[in-house]
């Protein structure tokens, strides 16, 4: 049985562009109503999970508040069937003034062309002692 591809590199690039524009409305157009988002930090082994479109929107809004100048660069994207991966370098300044630069990736799952799961990972950057 051939799996129908519902993800594309072009879609992942468009999502990245919306993130870099900090355009929450445009970002959310890519997400299904029953989507989920796993952020890299949080109280559980998977970070912090947001379930449903409204909760995902709030989680992303919080990200933009905590990293108001966040930018994703050096991106590479690929897809297989309904899954996609985006690798990137995230830069930004935390609300407390601390500058952040980390490599990370997003694992994406799509259904009917919409994101149903975004799972984000960041490298842990440790300053030398």
Over which residues does each language-model region extend?
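Short, low-complexity N-terminal intrinsically disordered segments enriched in polar/charged residues
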Residues: 1-33, 129
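A beta-strand edge to alpha-helix "cap/lid" segment located at domain peripheries
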Residues: 2-7, 57, 61-129
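Acidic side chains
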Residues: 17-25, 34, 38, 69, ...
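Short glycine/serine/threonine-biased micro-segments
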Residues: 20, 50, 90
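A solvent-exposed, acidic/Ser-Thr-rich amphipathic alpha-helical stretch
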Residues: 26-81
């Amino acid at each position: 049985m051939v799996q129908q591809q519902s993800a594309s590199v072009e879609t992942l690039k468009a999502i990245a562009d919306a993130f870099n524009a900090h355009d929450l409305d445009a970002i959310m157009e890519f997400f299904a109503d029953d989507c989920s988002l796993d952020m890299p930090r949080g109280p559980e082994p998977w970070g912090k999970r947001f379930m449903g479109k409204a909760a995902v929107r709030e989680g992303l809004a919080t990200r933009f508040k905590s990293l108001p100048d966040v930018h994703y660069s050096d991106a590479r994207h690929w897809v297989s069937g309904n899954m996609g991966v985006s690798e990137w370098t995230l830069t930004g300044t935390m609300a407390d003034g601390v500058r952040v630069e980390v490599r990370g990736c997003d694992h994406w799952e799509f259904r009917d062309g919409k994101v149903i799961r975004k799972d984000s990972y960041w490298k842990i950057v440790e300053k030398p002692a």
